[in-house]
Amino acid sequence: MNRLIILVVAAVFLGMASAEEDVLKRGFPCRCDSDGPSVHGNPLSGTIWVTSCATGWHKCNSENELFHECCKQG
């Protein structure tokens, strides 16, 4: 029984750790200036951040939005 509890706790801990790594991969994609013109099929390399870009990210388009920014990591 104790082994089962330890196994469950370890599984939950590992699940939380992997979810934390995926946080930066989530969000809605947006078009950076480096993506080229707005044509169907172009990749969207930016991620929308509310209010301003996070540490380690930079604004990647020239549009001025009031409540969000299109940011790229790096």
From Swiss-Prot:
Keywords: Amidation, Cleavage on pair of basic residues, Disulfide bond, Hydroxylation, Ion channel impairing toxin, Nematocyst, Neurotoxin, Secreted, Signal, Toxin, Voltage-gated sodium channel impairing toxin
Source organism superkingdom: Eukaryota
Disulfide bonds: 30-70, 32-60, 53-71
Main location: secreted
Short name of any one Pfam family annotated for the protein: Toxin_4
InterPro entries, per the entry: Myo_ane_neurotoxin_sf
Keyword flag Disulfide bond: yes
Propeptide stretch(es), residue numbers: 20-24
Subcellular location: Secreted; Nematocyst
Modified residues (Hydroxyproline): 29
Gene3D superfamilies found in the cross-reference section: Anthopleurin-A
UniProt GO molecular function: sodium channel regulator activity; toxin activity
Record's keyword annotation contains Disulfide bond: yes
GO CC list: extracellular region; nematocyst
Residue numbers bearing the Glutamine amide modification: 73
Signal peptide: 1-19
Function summary: Inhibits voltage-gated sodium channels (Nav).
Family: Belongs to the sea anemone sodium channel inhibitory toxin family. Type I subfamily.
Name of the protein: Delta-actitoxin-Amc3a
